[in-house]
């Protein structure tokens, strides 16, 4: 999964961007009440386990 695809899913589920970092962005999920980091590495694929963990923290999966 690419970062852009992941961000679309996060926005659809109601998550919001909290802060930009140098290589990662900090997001907040109102469903879970958690803050979580999303890597911002251009058009590269995000590892499957990393994407699964981010989606779980966001309350999407």
Predicted features and spans:
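Positions that flank functional sites
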Residues: 25
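Basic nucleic-acid-binding interfaces
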Residues: 1-20, 28-61
